[in-house]
């Protein structure tokens, strides 16, 4: 399970180093293989360990090729999907189209989301956090059926 936000850098070759604490689980459980694709709701990237991505692919396979919305979803997620492998230094290469989609520059945030990571431009991440806090503060959580029993 992946959790926490890590500030990392994009090097001049378009690579990022995965934080050390995640490398061993990625190597042991997923052979260092990661699939990167776009987030369809935010300008960030999603990084899935290979076995988690295979679950997504199984769901995508069940979607219709004749329904416009379902086909569009498949086209975006699979069209941008790019499999990478951790190198000996724990780095992965982010392809240029994916970097452009998420407006990634030198300073990046890698954010654990349990079964995957989100990859954000640092400034976009800070804006996203502000938006999330505003949303949570403006809503009555008890009125949300899924959050009614949630407590910290």
From Swiss-Prot:
The keyword Ribonucleoprotein does not apply. Residues 5-52, 81-124 form the SpoVT-AbrB domain. Gene3D superfamilies: Transcriptional regulator MraZ domain. It is found in: Cytoplasm, Nucleoid. Pfam families: MraZ (PF02381). One of its GO terms (cellular component) is cytoplasm. Keywords: Cytoplasm, DNA-binding, Repeat, Transcription, Transcription regulation. GO terms for molecular function: DNA-binding transcription factor activity; transcription cis-regulatory region binding. The keyword Zinc does not apply. InterPro entries: MraZ, MraZ_C, MraZ_dom, MraZ_N, MraZ_sf, SpoVT-AbrB_dom, SpoVT-AbrB_sf. GO terms for biological process: negative regulation of DNA-templated transcription initiation. PANTHER family: TRANSCRIPTIONAL REGULATOR MRAZ. Belongs to the MraZ family. Forms oligomers. This is Transcriptional regulator MraZ. It comes from Shewanella baltica (strain OS155 / ATCC BAA-1091).
């Amino acid at each position: 399970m992946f959790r926490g936000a890590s500030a990392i850098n994009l090097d001049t070759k378009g690579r990022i180093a995965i934080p050390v604490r995640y490398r061993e689980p990625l190597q042991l459980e997923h052979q260092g293989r990661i699939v990167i694709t776009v987030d369809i709701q935010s300008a960030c990237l999603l990084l899935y360990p290979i076995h988690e991505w295979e679950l997504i692919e199984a769901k995508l396979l069940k979607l219709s090729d004749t329904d416009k919305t379902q086909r569009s979803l498949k086209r975006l997620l699979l069209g941008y999907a790019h499999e990478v492998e951790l190198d000996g230094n724990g780095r992965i290469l982010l392809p240029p189209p994916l970097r452009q989609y998420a407006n990634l520059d030198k300073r990046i945030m890698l954010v654990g989301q349990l079964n995957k990571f989100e990859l954000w431009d640092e400034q976009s991440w800070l804006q996203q956090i502000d938006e999330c806090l505003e949303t949570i503060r403006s809503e009555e959580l008890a009125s949300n059926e899924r959050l009614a029993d949630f407590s910290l």
